[in-house]
Amino acid sequence: MAAPSLRTARLLLPFALLAAWLAVGGFLGPFAGRLGEVSTNDQAAFLPRSAESTRVLTEQRAFRQRETLPVIVVWTADGGGSVRRQQAAATTALASLTRTPGVAGRTSPALPAEDGRALQGVVPLRPDLGGRLPAALDRIRAAADRVPGTTAQLAGPAATQGDLGDAFAGIDGLLLGVALAAVLVILLLVYRSVLLPFLVILSAVFALGLACALVYALADHGTVRVDGQVQGILSILVIGAATDYALLFSARYREELTRHADRFTAARAALRRSWGPITASAATVALGLLALLLSDLTNNRSLGPVGALGIGCALLSSLTFLPAALVLLGRSAYWPTRPRATDGTDSAHGLWQRVAGVVDRSPRTVWASCLVALLACAAFAPTLASRGVPLSETFVDDAPSVTAQDTLDRHFPGGSGNPAVVIADAARLPRVLAAARHTEGVASAAAVSASGRPGAEPLVAGGRARADVTLRSAADSDDARDTIARLRSSVRAVPGAHAVVGGYTAQRYDTLRTAERDRTLIVPVVLAVILVILAGLLRSLLMPVLLVATVAVNFLATLGVSALVFRHVFGFSGTDPSVPLYGFVFLVALGVDYNIFLMSRVREESLRHGVRQGVARGLVSTGGVITAAGVVLAATFAALGVIPLAFLAQIAFIVAFGVLLDTLVVRSLLVPALVRDIGRLAWWPGRLSRRPDVREVPRTPRTADEVR
């Protein structure tokens, strides 16, 4: 029994840490609900910095007083007939908006479709409206609804941005609530402890509050950029990672309580043996996310530092707040059970003992069967189309802007309202227009005039002139992107024109090309970072290669299954170009996490008992807690599905399914069987590869999973 003065001294640090985190939660916790104040859902964030379409955006500023965000108003007759009689009223409604707050400049007249069954007009809005955009859209909708005998709808970039804002509305409370509820239910079912799940969740909430406060400060000063997508991923990432790290530490502490009567000694032993794998895991995820800084897409670059900061906060909370809380509570934290050194084993231990026995007896059969199954799934990975999705598939539900765009496409040329923008030297503009009109897939091409009237003198700025080119295909279609490629070739062929092509479709085309380039660059960097971290942790060169290879196979298998599910279950024709990259970064980094936890324990046991027994002991010791952590992480990412955006729903499925596949198959069967079959050589050139194996009768290891 420690002396009272010594016990008091040992309580000071845990109490100080607990007080510090309670202060963090009290003062910084509200920032988790305030990130929306500094976030923006401007679609310009998805544009490549160095792309031709981005250059066009820059040049366009010379042709007008300010940037605009257009709203396309489309009218159809209530009875489905002609709307030509309402054209004057529609033009009047548009003109009445000119001096409305948020409108940037003159509105267009209402123009009829060739079939006479629809009208369209454009209202230019200021691009910096932010939270005032919904009110501006409401005013436009109210004016458009005053045209008698018609139904008015709003399409175009501003309407889409408004629907994106609606999709992310309430993201703070809803997403966090769903994620935490899922975590709590799983922890209560798995650990059958009343207090521990709440401590784990409190640790995750404190980490999220600290991360959001730091990100808020950085975003408020313009250092990082935050949108609803980054905000949602940050919440899920921090909750999932903090829960995982907390589970791994609490499991190791519980195990040490079965070895040490003194809770302080048990806490020191748990920290000493768990901080290395947990820190390596956090470093893997953080550095993998920071690799996104190499991306040319603003949104990807924003997620990198924001996500890495969140992982750092999760690590800090899990290795400071949780140990302090657990050491103060001692064995009471696991109530109604109280782990003691005399405790025995239970059925959960028996399950992993049986799994380890199968792996030990038939390792080659186990890993070969797993590998064949994974490769069979991976065979479908090339069928996952990541060339972007049409606007109709951007939202999981039918958004008003999507319905309006469908109406527009039925009555006007596919690219109407979203023309390609061509900027060229003014002296060569007639030849550029001729080249554009002769390009396959182009419906019309006209110079932009100062008066806005067709056929008037072209507007010239700095010796450059602008033309709008309407495409025959829908602006978000594959055919339209192919037309952009042909259009660029055509106008570049005009000598001395120095023509560049931008606009909505060109931006999508450039984003696709940039996403392909990003994958080619970032994937090898992430793999290299993981290999270096694993080599340093495991003191081996062959083992890191083996682990990364298994995680890569798991990723490809996940993509294969996702391709089938997206097309045949969810009805998605494809994915956003960034989905495979995000899936890779999250799944590979998080997948390596579980291999780090497993193999660091296998190495620890192998140094004591030999490689063969080390594999079995490591699997039995970590099986329950890693499986629980994987289920929790999968459920946390699945919570992204509550946001009605296809992009996040696809990320949610890929990561959730991939984590479960990795946890239940790769980490539980494939990796242990491979290491068992390869033997000491798997640890080459570390000292384990040179040590003779110890042959002894396995005794039942004592772990956190044994005591319930």
Language-model features, listed with the residues they occupy:
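Membrane-embedded transmembrane helical bundles of large multi-pass transporters/channels
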Residues: M1-V38, V103, P127-S386, T505-R708
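Short, solvent-exposed beta-strand/turn patches at coil↔beta or beta↔helix junctions
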Residues: T40-P48
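Short, contiguous strand/loop micro-motifs
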Residues: Q43-A44, G80-G81, N299-S302, T342-D343, ...
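A general boundary/transition motif marking the beginning of the first structured unit of a protein
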Residues: P48, C313, D343-S347, V396, ...
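Structured non-transmembrane domains adjacent to transmembrane bundles in polytopic membrane proteins
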Residues: R49-P70, D78-Q161, T383-G574, I596
